[in-house]
Amino acid sequence: MVPSLERGISITSSFNLDRMFDSSPGKEQQQPHLAETTMPESQTQDSLGGSPVETSRPMTSRLISRRQDKQQSETEMMKDRFTKLLLGEDMSGGGKGVSSALALSNAITNLAASIFGEQTKLQPMAPDRRARWKKEIDWLLSVTDHIVEFVPSQQISKEGVCTEIMVTRQRGDLLMNIPALRKLDAMLIDTLDNFRGHNEFWYVSRDSEEGKQARNERTKDKWWLPPVKVPPNGLSESARRMLHFQKDSVSQVQKAAMAINAQVLSEMAIPDSYIESLPKNGRVSLGDSLYKSITEEWFDPEQFLSTLDLSTEHKVLDVKNRIEASIVIWKRKLHLKDNKSSWGSAVSLEKRELFEERAETILVLLKQKFPGLPQSSLDISKIQYNKDVGHAVLESYSRILESLGYTEMSRIDDVLYADSLARKQCTGEETSDGGKIATETDSASAGSSNYSGEEIEKLESQNSSKTTLLDFIGWSDNSSKGQSEKPPKSPRMTPKKLSYLEKLENLNGFRSPKDRH
């Protein structure tokens, strides 16, 4: 009993001595009394157990254990994801899974759909969804770190002898495009962050009275989105300029992602199953009317598109599929060396190259005018039968960024449309209250402020084609100038072959074929 008491007194004395330098003078006078006071061992241990020194240890251990549990759960999740990829999405292990390239492409697409599918408003992403996106896309993109190629490198030995050896490096297209796509990804997410704290427009519930009143012709086809509201007088000039600036920035990002996606798709091999399903000539694929328009002596791609019925997405996609099929047919006829093939035709090679160039021009215009168009039959076939994992990652990553850019631009257009309606309504009310305008002017202004549903939809489609769809390439619409005038007659020459990226940059030169140098 005596040793235990002495041990308790010594521990208490040392504890009070350590705290003596931090105590006030009044407390210093009480410490000798505290040091001489004897306490039972149980009370001494209880008092020591409540000290900050002892309580900090279990708290630290709990934090460490939680962190370890979180890391372990993330590791298990990553193992499950990669197990599913290795099995080709066939968890039964029966060998019925898809290729690794297609499985990885589907994984990136499904991840983006689960993360960005809930982005229905112009507002920053939720922190948990943002963290999940960054973490899981890093997992999927880490596969490309191990897709390497051999490149020559010089190594200097200790004796000063320079020797050339082969070293591994990430494949060239991945080394260039993966960092670029990551940058585009960050720019799109930062665009959403730029709308933090803006209170000049807001969203209301679809089922509320205010939400029903906020519905218009533009939002009737987007019933799943919450209607946007703006002040009665519309947005301020600074807010309107900010929206246009963000829209231009997103359009440039989408243009870059679209160019990367088109380049990757062009490098993918065309599957044999798609080639076997094609007709023998381009006339059958296009149809008589389209073939006649493309093969005429005078050809203007804008005028050609204006004559087509592109009122629905299905019709636009059908035209795109027909044109892509004809391009594949003409290219095969140009490069096929087998004279016994049944692909022979009486059309000369120069004309076939000219027709191919015109068809590719139409494709570029369709992709720019309808950026949200679904994938064509050729693109789906390439993605489905692709075996290159690197191409699969680049194609899927660029495609989802292109889709995210289109979504953000659509949300910005919704706000700008609501602002235009509010300003038109405000202008109409001021005009009717003034009473100083003639009757004819009143009727004209009333007609302009009370558009019918079809007129509003037509007006918005025209404005959208001027600002949203053609803005990707910095090309203004000049279709209103001289539509009835024929282009000047030029000698029949074989056009210069341009790549898809060159067409995006030099779209203004598509009115007439150029000389092939």
Curated annotation (Swiss-Prot):
Keyword Membrane: yes
One GO BP annotation of this record: regulation of pollen tube growth
Extent of Basic and acidic residues compositional bias: 66-76
UniProt domain PRONE: residue ranges: 65-429
Subcellular location as annotated: Cell membrane
Tissue: Expressed in pollen grains and pollen tubes.
Pfam families found in the cross-reference section: PRONE (PF03759)
Keywords carried by this UniProt record: Cell membrane, Guanine-nucleotide releasing factor, Membrane
Transmembrane segments: none
Gene Ontology CC terms, in alphabetical order: plasma membrane
Region described as Disordered: spans on this chain: 16-76, 428-517
Gene Ontology molecular function, alphabetical: guanyl-nucleotide exchange factor activity
Biased composition (Polar residues): 39-63, 440-452
Signal peptide (residue range): none
Record function comment: Guanine-nucleotide exchange factor (GEF) that acts as an activator of Rop (Rho of plants) GTPases by promoting the exchange of GDP for GTP.
UniProt free text on domains: The PRONE (plant-specific Rop nucleotide exchanger) domain is responsible for the GEF activity.
Subunit relationships: Interacts with ARAC11/ROP1 and ARAC10/ROP11. Interacts with PRK6.
Identification of the protein by name: Rop guanine nucleotide exchange factor 9
Highest classification ranks of the organism: Eukaryota, Viridiplantae, Streptophyta, Embryophyta, Tracheophyta
